[in-house]
């Protein structure tokens, strides 16, 4: 059976790996699956890619053909779909987006009734249907055919929700926003304007093909220059669907997800709002984050890479803050998934309440030099479990001791082994990574 869903939904080049036929069938199965005992209600959002409209129509056709009602949020963010599912009694949410990928890619992300990424068993059933392993589903007829409903009001309610969160307004503060020509273009400025910030926005003119192109959280250098050149107090960059956020302080320094978790974790702990005094991270967070959390008497948990796993850990243990270095940050009091705009509001609240600049708050965390090398291999499992690779990794880990670490893991979406080392200097990082890669090369595991 084919494996279509990865760590972040069904994603690939539009009409190459992910086709309108796939989207129609996903709609057919989802509409049938959730309509077993009642008429299913499914809410759909999309980002600004040209192909997002095409996939939206295909999904709606599939859903309504199976008897489900499809509610359209139109261009919006992934977290707004999650919010709508949780608060408006929908059975399921669908976001059409490939997040930070280039415009020619797209994806289908499914959210369960709690607004979180859908269970793996449901994805497996959809994959079986896509492969023809499940018999044809019945078509709705007459009045049982589903309706298509304009639900732009749901996006407006989400905006109101965001505005209600900060404890104070941001009056007088000059805030730069890089919307990546993506979903946040329709939302972010109105939120900050309502909170009385002086808002400066770039890359908020989507044309269907410019999403993430030299802009947004994956091209943070654009916002760095903009903040410094315009004398702004702070800046925030989002990705295509605005479920992640990277910040920039007034000096142009990048504040990534690890530093954001430190700043917000310390602030929430001081406020008595950090449940269990614990921050949930992934194995890719910087060693400096862990040492800084320990210094401030905070605990931490580590999960596999992916905000899906962070969210699961937070829900199981009732934690209030977690996230990834990449900027997926979850504040469980307000959201079930990573939310870039919410994250920027919480960073702003910490700065305003503590009467401090982001530069001052973030510099308390020392970042350890980190080197990540992606190695293309013929077979990920074979490469990772090779006895000589295992031996060199253990040897390097022993040498690093408590002043560094090594992590070797498989990519969830590509034929890559990721070799990551953190240590006291860049030179040590390079030396350790080189040794591991040379062993992989000598073992004939690497492909060009």
Model-derived features: where do they sit?
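Proline/glycine-rich low-complexity loops and linkers
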Residues: 124-159, 164, 250-323, 330-331
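Phosphate-binding and adjacent anionic-ligand microenvironments
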Residues: 234, 271-448
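Gly/Ser/Thr-enriched, mixed-charge loops and adjacent short helices
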Residues: 13, 106-230
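Buried hydrophobic positions in well-ordered alpha/beta secondary-structure cores of metabolic enzymes
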Residues: 8, 44, 81, 94, ...
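N-terminal small/polar loop signature for handling phosphorylated ligands or for N-terminal nucleophile
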Residues: 41-105, 190-248
């Amino acid at each position: 059976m084919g494996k279509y869903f990865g760590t972040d939904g069904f994603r690939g080049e539009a009409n190459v790996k992910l086709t309108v036929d796939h989207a129609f069938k996903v709609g057919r199965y989802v509409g049938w699956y959730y309509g077993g005992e009642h008429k299913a209600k499914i809410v759909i959002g999309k980002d600004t890619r040209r192909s997002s409209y095409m996939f939206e129509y295909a999904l709606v056709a599939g859903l309504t053909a199976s008897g489900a009602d499809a509610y359209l949020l139109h261009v919006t963010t992934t977290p707004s779909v999650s919010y709508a599912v949780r608060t408006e009694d929908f059975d399921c949410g669908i976001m059409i987006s490939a997040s930070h990928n280039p415009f020619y890619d797209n994806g289908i992300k499914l959210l369960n009734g709690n607004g979180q990424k859908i269970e793996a068993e449901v994805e497996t059933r959809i994959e079986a249907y896509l492969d023809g392993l499940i018999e044809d589903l019945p078509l709705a007829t007459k009045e049982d055919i589903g309706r298509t409903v304009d639900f732009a009001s749901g996006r407006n309610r989400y905006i109101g929700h965001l505005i209600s969160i900060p404890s104070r307004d941001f009056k007088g503060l000059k805030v730069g926003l890089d919307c990546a020509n993506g979903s946040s273009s329709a939302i972010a400025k109105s939120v900050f304007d309502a909170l009385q910030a002086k808002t400066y926005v770039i890359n908020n003119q989507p044309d269907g093909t410019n999403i993430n192109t030299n802009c947004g959280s994956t091209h943070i250098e654009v916002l760095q220059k903009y903040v410094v050149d315009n004398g702004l107090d702070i800046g925030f960059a989002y990705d295509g669907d605005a479920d992640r956020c990277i910040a920039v302080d007034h000096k142009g320094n990048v504040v990534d997800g690890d530093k954001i978790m430190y700043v917000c974790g310390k602030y929430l702990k001081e406020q008595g709002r950090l449940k269990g005094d614990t921050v949930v991270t992934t194995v890719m967070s910087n060693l400096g984050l862990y040492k800084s959390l320990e210094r401030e008497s905070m605990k931490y948990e580590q999960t596999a890479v992916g905000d899906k796993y962070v969210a699961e850990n937070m829900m199981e243990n009732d934690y209030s803050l977690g996230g990834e270095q990449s900027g997926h940050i979850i504040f469980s009091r307000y959201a079930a998934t990573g939310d870039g705009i919410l994250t920027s509001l919480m960073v702003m609240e910490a700065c305003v309440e503590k009467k401090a600049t982001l530069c001052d708050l973030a510099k308390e965390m020392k970042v350890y030099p980190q080197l990540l090398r992606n190695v293309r291999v013929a077979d990920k499992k074979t490469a990772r479990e090779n006895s000589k690779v295992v031996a060199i990794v253990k040897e390097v880990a022993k040498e690093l001791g408590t002043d560094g670490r090594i992590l070797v893991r498989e990519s969830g979406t590509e034929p890559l082994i990721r070799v990551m080392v953190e240590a006291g200097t860049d030179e040590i990082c390079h030396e350790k990574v080189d040794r591991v890669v040379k062993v992989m090369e000598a073992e004939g595991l690497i492909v060009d």
